[in-house]
Amino acid sequence: LFQQKYSEAKVLLDEVITSGKYKLLDNYFDNFNAEQNNNAEVVWSNQVAVNVAGAGYDRSQRGFDLSYPNAPDQPNLSGAGFQQPTFDLVNAYQVDENGLPMIDTYADHEFKNDQDIESSEAWEPDMETPVDPRLDWVVGRRGVPYHDWGLHPGKAWIRDQVSAGPYNQKKWIILENQLATYAYDNTAKFNAMNFNIIRYAQVLLWAAECEVEVGNPEKAKEYVNMIRQRAKDGSYVRLGDEAPFGNGPAAANYKVDIYKDSWAGLSKDVLRKRVRFEERLELALEGHFFFDLVRWDIAEDFLNKYIEREKRHIQYLNGAVFDKNHRYYAIPLTEIDRSYVDGKPTLTQNPGY
C-alpha cells in the first residue's frame, strides 16, 4: 500500500476482511476504552499493563502521558498538555445538512471555540452547528464532558493556548472510574489502555483506497459507509449525571450519515478525497495522518495550505513552510558510515540533509 501497489495490497486486505476474525465494534469510543482492550476490532496493538505481575508505571501506556491535560485542579488526571488537536481538525468534523463531511469547504467555517477566553469568563459551546459525533470522542473542548472527569473548563486545562490552541486530546484518556483498576497509583497518565496500531476500521479504509484505484468505486463506498454507519448508530457524548454516557441530552448537535449517492462515474480525484477524508476523521490522533499524506504524495500541498489556515490563530506558524524534503528523516551519519562496501557507501543521504 505504501508503495502504491494497490492491486497487490487489495489481495492481502481482502484476506483480512473475509477471514471473519475482525469486526467493527458497535461504539467508536470502545476502541479507546481500557476495559475493551484486545477487542474484535483490534488487528495489532501495543500491549501494556499495570497492577499485575509486578507491573508498575514502567509497563504502562507511557506514550501519551505528556498529552494529558494540564489540569492543576485534577491531580489524578493532569499531565503536560501536549499533542493538542488543531483548529483545522476540529473544523473538519463539521457536516452539511445531510450529515456528510464538507471536504472542500470545511475550512471556510470556523467552529466556535474559546481561544483567548479565560475559564472564569462566561462562554457557551455551539449547540447548533451540526458536527460528526466522533468529534467529542476525539477532542476535549470547553463545555463538553471530558469523559467522566467533568465538563472541560477550557483555558484552565490548556498548557498555552497561544502555542497550540484551546483543545486537548481525548482519545487516550482513561475514565476516572477506571483509576483503581487501570491506572498506576491513581495516576491516569500511567494506565493500562493498549495502543491500537492497526484497527479493522483502518483495514476497511485501506481496502476502500484500493477499490478506488482498481476501479470498483461502489465497493469503496460500501467500506466507507460501514465506518460512517457505526458513527451514526453508536453512542454520542451525553450531558447529565452519567456523562458522557447515559440518556442525557447530546453535548452538541450531532449529525452523521452514510453516502447515498452513486460513486460510479465520479472522478478518481473525488473518490480519493472522500476516502482520505474519512481516514482523517476516523483515525485522528492515532499517529497515521502525516504518513498518509506522504504516501498519497500530497504532504507538501496539504501542509502548506494547513499552515496558511492555522496561522490565523497560531502566530508562530507565520513564515513556516513545509519542505518536501521533510517527508523523510535524515539517515544517521553513523549508519551511512557503516554501510561502506569496497570503499563506497551503500546508503546515501536523503535529499535536503
Name these PLM-found stretches.
Residues 1-62, 66, 98-353:
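Acidic/polar-rich alpha-helix caps and helix-coil junctions
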Residues 62-94, 158-165:
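Short, cationic low-complexity segments
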